[in-house]
């Protein structure tokens, strides 16, 4: 169960903080429904976060009216649950559906509030990530040893495909003396991968090339499309610094990795790409480039309904020298 909790926490982290209000500062903006939902094949719980935008210049009072939600899976309406408090698995004041999803499942959603147009959206769970083989190996780097993640996969030539990758590092510290066992710890962190030698990520154009600006990926979720590899077999290679862990007379620290590979719907890929553009738009803050906005696929609203098919590896031991 802890692995599912880690994944849901990571999934939530790529979404904006969503409470009862979402501010819009455009002078001509109107209140809109805000919907964020990212159905996936991992686990059986689909989180739904719903709110209403609040126009900053509008000084009117807010109401406590509840939204009305409809969640249809392949045309069949499903029961929607609600939690008022944080559960350890779900955020406070969030909705959720308990249903195991699979590839090609079609999800339609509707959200309505009094005096607001009904917000609608839809998505489809993509086919599975076409993984052929994954490896975690120790290699020589410019400044010492490094860990390289190699992902071999076969892209389909029949459609446009969208992918993602994220690596989680687990650091476990265990004390040898029984009286210190309560101090044992486990820490999970997302891995900041070096992309410089991977052609799918490292190409720079325009201002990025002129000013040698490196692209960063929001929350270390690395995404790409198949425009360079359509219909081909390909091995993606990315790396990070080598942390050997340690062991002494008192304690032992061990390192493990878990790889998440995503097949993304076009909607979800486009949304994540817009997040990356916004976070990398340093020049926009100086008036040298246009300020970009978030992508949305919610009709009469704001937000995202985007599906993904997730591959989750087992925990992989740290390579040894």
Q: What do these predicted regions represent?
A:
Residues 2-8:
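Sec-dependent signal peptide recognition
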Residues 19-321:
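A sequence/structural signal for flexible, mid-protein segments enriched
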Residues 14-17:
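C-terminal motif of bacterial Sec signal peptides marking the signal peptidase cleavage site
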Residues 1-2, 19:
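N-terminal hydrophobic targeting signals that begin at the initiator methionine
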């Amino acid at each position: 169960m802890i692995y599912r909790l880690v994944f849901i926490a990571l999934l939530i982290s790529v979404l904006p903080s969503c409470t009862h209000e979402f501010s819009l500062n455009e002078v001509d903006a109107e209140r809109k429904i805000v919907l964020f939902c990212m159905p996936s094949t991992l686990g059986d719980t689909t989180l739904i976060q719903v709110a209403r935008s609040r126009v900053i210049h509008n000084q009117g009072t807010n109401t406590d009216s509840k939204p009305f939600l409809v969640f249809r899976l392949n045309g069949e309406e499903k029961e929607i649950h609600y939690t008022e408090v944080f559960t350890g698995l779900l955020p406070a004041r969030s909705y959720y559906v308990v249903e195991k999803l699979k590839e090609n499942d079609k999800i339609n959603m509707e959200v309505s509030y009094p005096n607001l147009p009904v917000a609608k959206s839809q998505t489809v769970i993509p086919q599975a990530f076409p993984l052929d083989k994954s490896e975690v190996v120790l290699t020589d780097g410019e400044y010492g040893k490094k860990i390289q993640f190699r992902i071999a996969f076969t892209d389909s030539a029949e459609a446009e495909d969208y992918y993602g990758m994220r690596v989680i590092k687990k650091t476990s510290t265990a004390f040898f003396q029984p009286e210190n066992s309560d101090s044992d710890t486990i820490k999970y962190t997302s891995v900041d991968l070096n992309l410089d030698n991977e052609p799918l990520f490292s190409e720079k154009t325009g201002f990025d090339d002129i000013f040698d600006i490196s692209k960063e990926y929001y929350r270390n979720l690395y995404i790409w499309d198949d425009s360079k590899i359509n219909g081909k077999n390909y091995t993606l290679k990315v790396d990070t610094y080598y942390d050997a862990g340690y062991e002494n007379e008192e304690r032992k620290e061990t390192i493990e990795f878990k790889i998440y590979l995503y097949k993304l719907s076009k909607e979800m890929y486009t949304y994540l790409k817009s997040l990356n553009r916004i976070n990398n738009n340093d020049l926009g803050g100086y008036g040298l480039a246009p300020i970009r906005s978030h992508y949305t696929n919610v009709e009469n609203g704001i937000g995202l309904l985007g599906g993904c098919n997730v591959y989750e590896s087992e925990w992989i031991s740290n390579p040894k020298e």
